[in-house]
C-alpha cells in the first residue's frame, strides 16, 4: 500500500490460467498484474479476462470495459471493516487512526460504513486452509512426478514445500 503500486486479486475465473491449470492453490490464488495505478490495472483486466476452453468456471463478463467502469458512480456502497486482527496482535495506533479516518471519509461521502467485531476463529481457518493448501501442493507435485517420470526429492523443493508434500500423503483434501 505504501510503495506506489496497486494490486488487485480478481475474482475466480476472471483471468484464464491456461488449459492445464484449472486454478491456483485450490482457488485461493488468481493471476493478475501489479500496476502503478487502478487505471492500469483496469486496462490489464480488459486485455486479459475472458473464457478459456477447459476452465471449470468463468466470471461473468462486465457490462462495459473495466476502464469504462472506473468512471461510473458506484452509488452508495455498504462497507464493513474490522480493526481487531484475528491473530491476537494489536494494530499500530497510526494504522488504526488511518483506518478510522478512512471509514469517516467514506461515510461522509454517503456510503454506509460499519465497524464489525471479529468473530473469526483462526484455528479453524488454519486447519481448513492448511488441508486445502497441503492437498493442492501434493496434487501439483504428484502431477509433476507423473509428467517427468521422476520422483520429487527433498533436494528439488524448498523445505516447507517438502514438508507439506509429505503431509499431503496422510490427509485428504476431499
Where do the language-model regions lie?
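Short low-complexity, flexible loop/linker segments enriched in glycine and/or proline
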Residues: 2-4, 123, 127-134
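Short polybasic/polar patches that bind polyanions
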Residues: 4, 107, 112, 142, ...
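An alpha-helix initiation/capping motif
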Residues: 96-100, 123, 158
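A short helix-breaking turn/cap at a secondary-structure junction
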Residues: 2, 6-102, 143, 147-151
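Proline- and acidic/polar-enriched loop/turn elements at helix boundaries
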Residues: 15, 21, 118-119, 157
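Short helix-loop capping/hinge segments that flank enzyme active sites or metal/cofactor-binding pockets
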Residues: 68-83, 131-174
Amino acid at each position: 500500500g505504501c510503495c506506489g503500486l496497486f494490486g488487485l486479486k480478481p475474482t475466480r475465473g476472471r483471468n484464464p490460467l491456461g488449459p492445464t491449470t484449472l486454478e491456483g492453490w485450490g482457488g485461493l490464488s488468481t493471476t493478475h498484474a501489479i500496476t502503478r495505478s487502478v487505471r492500469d490495472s483496469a486496462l490489464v483486466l480488459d486485455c486479459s479476462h475472458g473464457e478459456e476452453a477447459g476452465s471449470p468456471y468463468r466470471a461473468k463478463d462486465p457490462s462495459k470495459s473495466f476502464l469504462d467502469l472506473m468512471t461510473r458512480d458506484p452509488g452508495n456502497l455498504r462497507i464493513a471493516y474490522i480493526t481487531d486482527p484475528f491473530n491476537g496482535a494489536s494494530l499500530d495506533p497510526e494504522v488504526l487512526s488511518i483506518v478510522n479516518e478512512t471509514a469517516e471519509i467514506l461515510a461522509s461521502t454517503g456510503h454506509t460504513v460499519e465497524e464489525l467485531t471479529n468473530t473469526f476463529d483462526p484455528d479453524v481457518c488454519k486447519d481448513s486452509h492448511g488441508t486445502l493448501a497441503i492437498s493442492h501442493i501434493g496434487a501439483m507435485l504428484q502431477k509433476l512426478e507423473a509428467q517427468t517420470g521422476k520422483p520429487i526429492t527433498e533436494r528439488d523443493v524448498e523445505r516447507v514445500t517438502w514438508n507439506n508434500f509429505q503431509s499431503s500423503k496422510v490427509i485428504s483434501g476431499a
